[in-house]
Amino acid sequence: MKKIVALVLALMLALSMLTVATAETANPVAGKKVAYIMLLPSATIFQMWKDSCADLCAALDVEFDFYFCDGDFNRWMDTINTCAAAGYDGLLVSHGNQDGSYVFLKELTEKYPELKLVCFDTQFYTDGEYQKIEGVTQLFQQDKSLVTVLLDEMIAKFGEGVRLVKVWRGPNYNSPFDRREVGWQEYEAAGKIVTVGEIQPLQDSVDSANSVTAAYLQSLNREDVDGVIAYYDLYGQGVYNAIFENANFNGEAGEALPMASVDIDQVDVTNMQTRPDIWYAAGTTDWTLNGEIAMRLLLLELAGEYGVDVVEIPGSAILASALKEDSTVENLGEIAGETYGNLSYLSVADWMPADLLHK
């Protein structure tokens, strides 16, 4: 009789352990609703981000929406407010500007205390100091490194004191540009680079970057500049077109003017393959992986497993000379350095897909 009782107790214990294990691995985010809200216009890299977010959400039965705000900060704030009021469980918000984002998002979290937030490339800054919002994870590219890896390549090509033109919008247009500017200023202060001039597109578009760069080149002597750095690849496409269309800078009369840009998409890869003497390099991270990193952080918050305040992903230089004939924006990991596509930045949990969606 004692043996029977012991067997029954052992069976009950095994079943209880199985029940606990099953509960522990149950999906805690099924049925949740989240959105990705980007300040900037849609671009290939942001679509890569969005698609990886959508794939992960689909795998975990999470409803996913996305919104691009075409560089309009008021529209970005309105979209966030609308989603919060509509009962979204979590928001992944991207590229808020330095001045207004902290106050706005802090008030949002106070008004909707159950709403979970992950912020990408968005600094919390007010009254001359960087701030923190309790319970909100900030994910960044190491924006400074996205510029400095390009500056390092220009220095390797031309030596210290290389003369460069900078293409950006700022200061305080958006947080990523301001963070990239830190790297530029450090190199300039150290005498590693010399700023020949600055170009500021009027809009976040290829056409705007093309027109302002074309006008600027008319006032510039080729012998007075070594290269151009664009803080955003959309601007880079406009810069490339302006150089390509100008006989004094495209290689028809002397050496072509080399340029490099932050971020990358398929248009950039094609241009780098076509004219590596013009589009010399790009500084980037793996945008497909970035989206999954960010969404995993948000889903962890929704599951009550918040663990970190800040995550930073280092940049890699993609050299035109390293591209293969079959290189695309999707397979850059084949030719990029080890910092590109580093899976160590991915959060994991028992209830998340064990086989990572993006490797």
Predicted regions and their residues:
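Extracytoplasmic "Venus flytrap"
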Residues: G31-S52, L56, D65-D78, Y88, ...
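Hydrophobic alpha-helical segments within soluble ligand-binding/sensing domains
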Residues: P28, V136-V165, A209-V212, D263-V269, ...
